[in-house]
Amino acid sequence: MKGIKKSPTEESLYLEYSHQTEGCIFPLHTSVTLFLLSYCECKVFNVCLVLTEESTDTSDTSFLKEALPQDLEIQVISKQALPPIVQNCCLPAVVDQPDVFCRAGLAVVLRHIIQKSYEAEPSRKEILELLGFKKTCLKACAEVSQWTRLCELTIPLAVENFLQESSEHPPTIPEEILELERKLSEPVRVHNDDKLRRQKLKQQKAAGSEPPSGKGKAKSKASAQKTPKDLAAPSKSLELKVAFSKLTVQEDAAASNREPSHIRKAKAADLPPLEHVFAEGLYFTLADIVLLPCIHHFLVIICKKFSEKLEQFPLLTSWYQRIQEVPKVKTAASKCGIYFLYLPELLNSARKQPVNSDEVAAVDEQSDPLFIGGPRPTMTKLMEKGIEAMFSPHPCPAWTLDWSSLPAAVSPKEGKMSTDRALRKQQQLNNLVYLVLNQAKPGDRIVDFCSGGGHVGIVLAHMLPSCQVTLIENKELSLIRAKKRSDELGLSNIWFIQANMEYFTGMFNIGVALHACGVATDMVIEHCIQTRASFITCPCCYGFIQNTSKFNFPKSEKFKKTLSYKEHMLLCRFADQTAVQLPPERRLIGKQCMGLVDLDRAAAAGEHGYSVQVISMEPESCSPKNNMIVGVPL
């Protein structure tokens, strides 16, 4: 391990180092990233290990010798040596030269490592396959994706806490591990689900075993007694055949044969469910890469101190044994100090209990009841409590930027959209820019959340050269387009961060968001409140609003006292019905529902010491979603 000089085009990868416990590097995000680098044999990054404030001495690195891949050159630095843009983000993070474009957060960074590794070695198709079907594995943020939340947040944190607690006293098994065990018992859903299930039915018929009948009812005795060893035999599992044929780049010969009539005519409800081979289903993906270091270190402690608890995780241990068969996994693991355990066969406990889809459907129906009727009873209920949609007057409805005098790259027309749409986008920007210009002071830091192609942020950076503007967006291509426009303008007061907004930890004065989808608007407002920053948001996609791990609706006390969650969801559903092709009366109801949903948001922010207004954009025709929520700390 030694210092490395950065080339002008090289990207730097920054990983946090806190400490080691039981041979595991903390935080686990770093262990996971190092394992992926080892699996991909990736050498395209300048890798920097960032010591925490508790251990800032970078001269003595002997304690790291056994913990890091020895074929990977690593530079050890202190937090103070991080580029300014990285100091505003959670690690891991990757930065392009000249330190104005940053990718932060585990999922974003891992996906970028995969893409760069494949670009460096296109012959290794298995690297790109880690991104899964349509290349979407761990692409969605943790707020909307169960797997991203599990892999990026809950499992690493739960295992870290488990490892720390186990050194002092017998810990309890993390609920997150039990949740993962349950998820491995659920039927697999893949894009060619029906085809594979019919192949499995054919296989079972040929073997003389009866498939489960109707909607996930109990499996046959032969199927129920399947052990981990059975699952490791490709001749006995269609799922394994499919999974490992993909890993070895072979074609499944059965796929080209036309199925017999009785197989083709079988009802979908009578088809056997597909079982997990890997974490997300049949294929080895990035999710498995993330989970392996976490689950390995968890199982090490279980086997060493609480071996009697091992039988609680038959599916997890089967997955752990199976993943060792994936080419190059053992080699990559050993380079990272991960030496696989030998786990005894759990003959009795490894029996898989099928998920009863009738029960699942019943639970779903209870947790997500059907919407019945319109919003009028809910609106009347609010009116009886003195709550109505109220809009503050626009402070300057006729104000507009002189778009003709601005450089072409500032205009939304440069964002590859039609002339009509570009005009409406300009009208939307007029509203947000006016409000920001009225609040911004020289030296202020402005953050454009959910920035997309950078329409808001680029205009603000051009109009406010004395302010630092940061664009935060989860979609890489959108942010790359924004940077290209910024480069054409020669802007020097702008940063680009590809990350979920919670991984931005910097201080700022004003937060803006144009058409942040669903709960993203609530996340923006929450982020601004935590920093005591002003906010100007224009919500969108009201129909996607739902309770999450961070938010419960309604949000404000006065709405909570009046409406149930279901009634609030009813307002959200109808708030989305404002499209121009709808009848005027329906659009009016939609606008009122929008106003009520945003009034709840405004009231909740007011409870945190903000002066908040809900204002309609001018002209209102600039967008069906034309509300603005404007908040200033008192």
Swiss-Prot record:
Q: Does the keyword 4Fe-4S apply?
A: no
Cellular compartment(s): Cytoplasm
Task: Locate the region Disordered.
Answer: 189-233
Which Gene3D superfamilies is this protein grouped with?
1.20.1050.10, Vaccinia Virus protein VP39 (3.40.50.150)
UniProt cross-references to SUPFAM superfamilies, sorted A to Z: GST C-terminal domain-like, S-adenosyl-L-methionine-dependent methyltransferases
* Keyword Cytoplasm among record annotations: yes
The GST C-terminal domain sits at 131-333
What keywords would UniProt list here? Answer: Cytoplasm
- Cellular component GO terms held in the UniProt record: cytoplasm
PANTHER family, per database record: GLUTATHIONE S-TRANSFERASE C-TERMINAL DOMAIN-CONTAINING PROTEIN (PTHR13369:SF0), PTHR13369
Q: What is this protein called?
A: Glutathione S-transferase C-terminal domain-containing protein
